[in-house]
Design a protein with these regions (language model features):
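Lumenal/extracellular "mature" regions of secretory-pathway glycan-modifying transferases
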Residues: 204, 217-240, 244, 249-267, ...
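Metal-dependent phosphoesterases centered on the DNase I-like endonuclease/exonuclease/phosphatase
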Residues: 297-436
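Active-site flanking residues adjacent to catalytic metal/cofactor-binding acidic residues
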Residues: 127, 195-196, 292, 335-337
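Catalytic metal-binding/acid-base residues of hydrolase active sites
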Residues: 130, 198-199, 247, 295, ...
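Beta-strand-turn-beta hairpins that frame and shape the catalytic cleft
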Residues: 114-124, 236-250, 265-294, 472
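N-terminal, active-site-proximal structural segment of metallo-dependent hydrolase catalytic domains
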Residues: 1-210, 220-232, 237, 467-472
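Short proline/glycine-enriched turn/loop segments at secondary-structure junctions
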Residues: 231, 261-262, 416-421, 450-456
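Conserved beta strand-loop-helix elements of the APE1-like EEP
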Residues: 212, 234-251, 273-278, 334, ...
Length: 472
């Protein structure tokens, strides 16, 4: 039986900060990264000089600085070789994520007790940030990953402040279907934040330093690296980062075993977490979060379908292993960048996947038909740095108009024909389901499309407000 003194629950024995079981292994891993960094940095800068979006002035600077970078690369190689030989075997001992606990002064929301508070709302957010190593990020016309990470972190805090000292408020229950809104602000009262493409570890740490003290526990540096079955050499993690305003109880990560082209070097997969939300009849009220980022190349729909099937199996397995007798489940939410839309013929396989029979997508009416208020979430990279696309308020106003959507939202894959009216390609999803037999029922209150990160990434941010109420 759980009492008020058990809040927040103690999870030190389950979620330790270091991904290594012994401090010596953690120290060796830090040494390996230090040895690899000079070569990594020089190579990253060289790659960035030849990005298609590089300006002529940068190309001229690259010609002058290229010799210095090559010299640094050569000087760093004798350090990089032992660093790599140390780094590779350590990956077999590494837990596939880092855990940043909140500071001792952290105060979580008051536990939800349905006997006293009939319903509670929870706000979820998903965003693809394109925080790659700086050289690779330039290929998406998004340089300066470290500076962008700082600004993104500050912007995310704007979504936390309205409800730092209490639970997210629910409006009175309203009849009818939920609606969607387009806003220039970050969704208010964030409870759960799932970020994708946070590949650069320095950028990830900048975000963690912002989120952990102000929101709560954070899972970052997620992925299984090094030599993996296939065989694959995974050089980058999954890019996933999960932050929660409620205490984390358990977490796990599975890497997709199938990947092609550039994704073969990336540890994409499914990050699952269990959070405690409150107490009902002396037992825990919990929720499940499943964060993912699927295979990117458009033509690999069959591979994405296999990944969808795998993540459904992994989600079921994680939930079955985590549940305890008597506890109530408020929700199971699957969110992230699925890299397919619900409007293109090229994605017919994914659009008909059983995922949409297991989880509800509030933006979707049926196959190839979205709600009239749903909006595409991928922006055109060619217009990212125009004044309108770099201003949250100006971009919001532009996307309310058909002309603006044609100009600033990415077009169909492979240059296909645009639908009329054109609402863009929605790649970022927040889906949910209720648990069979549960006394707690989740319902969508609102879906939010946000331009708050305009100029900082090539995706819109998506938010979902979910109202969970107890059966009377």
């Amino acid at each position: 039986m759980q009492t008020q003194s058990d809040w927040p629950p103690v999870t030190d024995d389950i979620l330790r900060p270091s991904p290594f079981a012994h401090p010596v292994l953690h120290t060796l891993h830090c040494v390996a990264r230090v040895l690899l960094f000079p070569t990594y940095w020089a190579l990253d800068q060289l790659i960035g000089c030849w990005a298609p979006t590089a300006r002529p002035s940068r190309l001229r600077a690259a010609a002058g600085g290229g010799v210095a970078l090559l010299l640094l690369l050569l000087v760093g190689l004798p350090l990089a070789l032992p660093g790599l030989l140390l780094w590779l075997p350590l990956q077999a001992c590494r837990r596939p994520f880092c855990y940043q606990p909140p500071p001792p002064c952290w105060v979580p929301p008051t536990p939800w007790r349905p006997c006293a508070e009939f319903a509670r709302c929870f706000v979820f957010l998903t965003a693809n940030l394109c925080l790659l190593p700086d050289g690779l990020a330039r290929f998406s016309n998004l340089p300066h990953s470290q500076q962008r990470a700082e600004t993104i972190g500050a912007t995310l805090l704007n979504g936390l402040r309205p409800s730092l000292y209490g639970a997210t408020g629910c409006s009175p229950q309203r009849p009818g279907e939920p609606g969607g809104t387009l806003t220039a602000q970050m969704p208010a009262g964030l409870d759960f934040v799932c970020l994708q493409e946070v590949f650069d570890i320095r950028a990830a740490r900048r975000l963690v330093r912002r989120l952990a003290p102000n929101l709560g526990p954070v899972l970052y540096d997620v992925g299984t690296l090094g030599l993996q079955p296939g065989p694959y050499l995974k050089l980058l993690g999954s890019g996933l980062l999960l932050a929660s305003r409620y205490p984390l109880l358990r977490a796990n990560f599975h890497c997709f075993p199938n990947a092609r082209r550039e994704d073969a070097f990336v540890s994409k997969g499914l990050l699952s977490a269990q959070v405690q939300l409150g107490i009902l009849d002396g037992h825990r009220i919990v929720g499940f979060l499943h964060c993912t980022h699927l295979h990117a190349p458009t033509e690999d729909g069959l591979l994405r379908c296999k990944q969808l099937t795998l993540l459904l199996d992994w989600a079921e397995q994680f939930e079955a292993e985590s549940r305890q007798s008597g506890e109530a489940v408020a929700f199971s939410v699957l969110l992230g960048d699925l890299n397919f839309d619900n409007c293109s013929k090229d994605h017919a396989r994914e659009q008909g996947h059983k995922l949409f029979r297991c989880f509800r997508d509030p933006c979707r009416l049926s196959t190839r038909q979205d709600q009239p208020w749903a909006l595409g979430t991928i922006l055109s990279t060619s217009t990212l740095h125009q004044s309108v696309a770099s201003s949250p308020e100006m971009l919001r106003r532009a996307l309310e108009q058909e002309k603006g959507r044609h100009l600033y939202l990415a077009g169909p894959p492979r240059g296909g024909r645009r639908a009329n009216p054109w609402l863009g390609r929605r790649l970022d999803y927040i889906t949910y389901r209720e648990m069979p037999g549960s006394v707690l029922i989740p319902e969508v209150e609102q879906v939010m499309f946000s331009t708050a990160l305009a100029g900082l990434t090539d995706h819109l941010t998506v938010g979902l407000q979910l109202r969970v109420s107890a059966l009377s």
